[in-house]
Swiss-Prot record:
Organism per entry: Canis lupus familiaris (Dog)
Location in or out of the cell: Secreted
Family (UniProt): Belongs to the calycin superfamily. Lipocalin family.
GO molecular function term, any single one: retinol binding
Protein known as: Beta-lactoglobulin-2
Signal sequence range: none
Length: 161
């Protein structure tokens, strides 16, 4: 899957801090369609390291409870792309952010034959911003695969530790 690169001038330190998963989309909806689906994760915090890597704190349902996990994303030659080892996903990239309100990112499994893509719209607050969700939907349309949208915006659906 060839992804348009939009964040070449990313300031990684500015994405640090608390985020909330507001919308999710995937090329294969089975990756998201149940609370225990493999990529149904709720981002809590992004922590850039001094080496420009990224520690991602997320929550996910496992064994009928919400657990916190950390995913280490290693920098690549592209400012907004990172290598990860999470489930079968092997790359994460930031599609767009204004640093203060929203951040769109995607996780990709580039290995054939199970190529897949999952993207999320993150927000700094739990307040739903329809303008940002609209922008996320437009960003999804630029991707080379059809994405199916899931809106986990009801707070009770969120996985809280």
């Amino acid at each position: 899957i060839v992804i348009p690169r939009t964040m070449e001038d990313l300031d990684l330190q500015k994405v640090a801090g608390t985020w909330h998963s507001m919308a999710m989309a995937a090329s294969d909806i089975s990756l998201l369609d149940s609370e225990t689906a493999p990529l149904r994760v709720y981002i809590q915090e992004l922590r850039p390291t001094p080496q420009d890597n990224l520690e991602i704190v997320l929550r996910k349902w496992e064994d009928n409870r919400c657990v916190e996990k950390k995913v280490f994303a290693e920098k690549t030659e592209l400012a907004a792309x990172f290598s990860i080892n999470y489930v079968e996903e092997n790359q994460i990239f930031l599609l767009d952010t204004d640093y203060d309100n929203y951040l769109f990112f995607c996780m990709e499994n580039a290995n054939a034959p199970q190529q897949s893509l999952m993207c999320q719209c993150l927000a700094r607050t739990l307040e739903v911003n329809n303008e940002v969700i609209g922008k996320f939907n437009r960003a999804l349309k630029t991707l080379p695969v059809h994405m199916q949208l899931l809106n986990p915006t009801q707070v009770e659906e969120q996985c809280l530790v």
